[in-house]
């Protein structure tokens, strides 16, 4: 069972965070939250999202699992206006989800959860380096790197006390180093890994809205991004596998 009302912008933010990586997901409902964890089709990136009941204007749910077509949901939320209140109602007998807002009422068929990949287990990886970065600064650096390369290195230089982002093209080079004055926080542990710009561009557009993003790094290890949504009543985590650097 699910019956909830939420601000349209909060729901849009949540769907956008998931849509950055996947087109469908298993959405788990509980008495106090909804959550999902999904991996992209190439097994390169993972998204986890939790939205607490306090993010909603009203919320009533029991434990359950829904198969959501995220691509379809993204098209629907494009119709929602600022200030709209969205009501979500699970029609159990029809296995449909009803979305009502601004005079519209959509009834969408849910996907069979058995056709959707099971929730992945988060890898137990030690990522000792940590930088807390303003979301817009992170996104701007990703966009700047995309101009000259299809990959970007993220790292921490403990000697210089900086978190840096660096890209190398055929003839061009760009580097942005953020010091302690420009960061929210820094754990100065040597770290550096190379990542695909394509994945980061999609994540970056979502992270740009966050006041701060926690970035966890190692050496040639995945990167983990963690940030709040819904005024602190929700949380998103991205995990991205590294690209192997050629010698």
Curated annotation (Swiss-Prot):
Question: What biological process terms from GO does the record include?
Answer: leading strand elongation; regulation of DNA replication
Superkingdom of the organism of origin: Archaea
- The portions of this protein that span the membrane are none
Sorted keywords for this record are:
DNA replication, DNA-binding
Q: What's a single GO MF annotation on this record?
A: DNA binding
**UniProt keyword DNA-binding, yes or no:** yes
Q: Which Gene3D superfamilies match?
A: 3.70.10.10
Q: Report any Pfam family annotated for this entry.
A: PCNA_N
CDD domains the UniProt entry points to? PCNA
**What protein family does this chain belong to?**
Belongs to the PCNA family.
Q: Which HAMAP family match?
A: DNApol_clamp_arch (MF_00317)
Subunit architecture: Homotrimer. The subunits circularize to form a toroid; DNA passes through its center. Replication factor C (RFC) is required to load the toroid on the DNA.
The name on file for this protein is DNA polymerase sliding clamp
């Amino acid at each position: 069972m699910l019956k909830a009302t939420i601000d349209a912008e909060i729901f849009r933010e949540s769907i956008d965070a998931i849509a950055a990586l996947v087109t469908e997901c298993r959405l788990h409902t509980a008495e106090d939250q909804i959550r999902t964890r999904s991996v992209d089709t190439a097994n390169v990136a993972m998204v986890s999202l939790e939205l607490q009941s306090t993010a909603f204007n009203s919320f009533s749910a029991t434990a359950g699992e829904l198969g959501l077509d995220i691509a379809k949901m993204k098209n629907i939320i494009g119709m929602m206006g600022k200030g709209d209140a969205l009501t979500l109602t699970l029609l159990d007998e029809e296995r449909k989800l009803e979305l009502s807002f601004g005079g519209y009422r959509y009834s969408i068929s849910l996907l069979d959860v058995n056709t959707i990949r099971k929730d992945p287990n988060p890898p137990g990886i030690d990522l000792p380096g940590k930088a807390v970065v303003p979301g817009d600064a992170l996104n701007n650096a990703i966009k700047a790197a995309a101009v000259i390369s299809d990959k970007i290195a993220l790292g921490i230089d403990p000697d210089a006390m900086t978190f840096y982002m660096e890209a190398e093209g055929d003839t061009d080079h760009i580097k942005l180093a953020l010091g302690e004055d420009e960061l929210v926080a820094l754990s100065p542990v040597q770290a550096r890994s190379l990542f695909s710009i394509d994945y980061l561009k999609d994540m970056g557009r979502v992270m740009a809205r966050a006041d701060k993003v926690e970035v966890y790094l190692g050496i040639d290890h995945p990167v983990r991004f963690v940030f709040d949504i819904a005024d602190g009543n929700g949380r998103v985590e991205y995990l991205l596998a590294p690209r192997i650097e050629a010698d």
